[in-house]
């Protein structure tokens, strides 16, 4: 079976989360090397989760997930925010993308805490730092709680700054989850009614 034929359930799911216009879609495009997600200066361009399968070396087959902004507004916006949070249930590794020019906002901090509650391995990316001299802009409490193997990543989807560092970080975090993937993967959801059929024939194959 080729890499492109790997079932979704056997892939490490990497989700990109953050506020509108934090540059999630641009960063995802930079990581995948493709124009997968629509990019625009207009807030709320991503209205539904977008997925892309790829190979992330040395990890292997992964599924990248772009999500709607967690600060969307209005009745429809609230539904999009809820959908983004629901995607955490399918995420093995989370990427919290923060606008490096403004630093983390309350919505970022709320998402960060939810990611930690779910014990999802994560990386914090300060995006839009086009100048190599631009550094950590007030990530504060968020960066102080990051695992030592993944420090704050200063990045620019436009210039490519930090993209390789992010790939390496995701590969390390993904390795931690690789052996804990469930057999059923994304086939069932919480509260689903499941019937388990067990063969009682002694001649039935084991497994």
Model-derived regions: residue spans:
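Helical mechanochemical/support elements of P-loop NTPase systems and associated helical scaffolds
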Residues: 42, 46, 50, 80-90, ...
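Conserved G1/Walker A P-loop phosphate-binding module
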Residues: 1-78, 82-90, 117
């Amino acid at each position: 079976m080729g890499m492109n034929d790997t079932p979704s359930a056997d892939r490490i799911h990497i989700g990109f989360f953050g506020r509108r216009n934090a540059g999630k879609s641009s960063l995802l495009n930079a990581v995948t090397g493709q124009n997968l997600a629509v990019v625009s200066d207009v807030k709320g361009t991503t209205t539904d989760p977008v997925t892309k399968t790829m190979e992330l070396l040395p990890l292997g087959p992964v599924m990248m997930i772009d999500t709607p902004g967690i600060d969307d507004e209005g009745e429809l916006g609230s539904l999009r925010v809820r959908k983004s949070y629901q995607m955490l249930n399918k995420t093995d590794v989370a990427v919290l993308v923060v606008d490096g020019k403004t630093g983390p906002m309350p919505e970022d901090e709320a998402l960060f805490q939810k990611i930690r509650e779910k014990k999802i391995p994560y990386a914090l990316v300060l995006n839009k730092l086009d100048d190599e001299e631009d550094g950590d802009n007030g990530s504060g409490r968020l960066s102080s709680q990051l695992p030592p193997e993944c420090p704050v990543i200063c990045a620019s989807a436009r210039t490519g700054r930090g993209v390789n560092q992010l790939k390496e970080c995701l590969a390390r975090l993904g390795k931690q989850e690789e052996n804990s993937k469930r057999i059923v993967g994304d086939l069932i959801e919480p509260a689903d009614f499941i019937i388990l059929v067990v063969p009682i024939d002694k001649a039935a194959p084991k497994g």
